A protein has these predicted regions:
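Intrinsically disordered, Lys/Arg-rich N-terminal extensions and targeting peptides
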Residues: 1-61, 67, 106-120
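Short coil/turn segments at secondary-structure boundaries
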Residues: 52-56, 72-73, 99
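Short, electropositive, low-hydrophobicity segments enriched in small/polar residues
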Residues: 27-31, 88, 93
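Mid-chain, well-packed structural core segment of small domains
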Residues: 59-91
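C-terminal structural segments of small proteins and small subunits
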Residues: 91-114
Length: 120
């Protein structure tokens, strides 16, 4: 039985990693060991940051909603506003609320009034 080598598979694997390392600076894009480490670290960061992106956007939406609510009515804050919307039966998610706060302040103002009315 003839001895086999893993040359083809190894070349494919190296090619895959070096293609992924295109655009990296210096040896990170050319040297096999350095490129492999850089690409794997990049994959770790992208996995982690896909999770973090969801949290960061939620924080951004909440910040925008809070700022818009306080601008419309000084007595309300974010948590009381969301409680008022829930009591009023308005089911709008934070992403849409933040978009309304930025693009259409009159519609957002009506939501603020409905939330305030349901609280009192």
């Amino acid at each position: 039985m003839a001895r086999t080598t893993s040359a083809v598979a190894r070349h494919r694997k190296k090619k895959k990693y070096l293609r992924a390392a295109r655009g990296y600076f210096g040896g990170r894009s050319k040297l096999w060991r350095v490129a492999k480490n850089a690409v794997e670290r990049g994959w770790q960061y992208s996995y982690r940051d896909r999770k973090q992106r969801k949290r960061q956007f939620r924080r951004l939406w909440i910040t925008r909603i809070n700022a818009a609510v306080r601008e419309q009515d000084t007595e309300l804050n974010y948590s009381r506003f969301m409680n008022g919307l829930k009591r009023a039966g308005v089911e709008v998610n934070r992403k849409v609320l933040a978009d309304l706060a930025v693009t259409d302040s009159t519609a957002f103002g009506e939501l603020v009034q409905r939330a305030k009315a349901s609280l009192s």
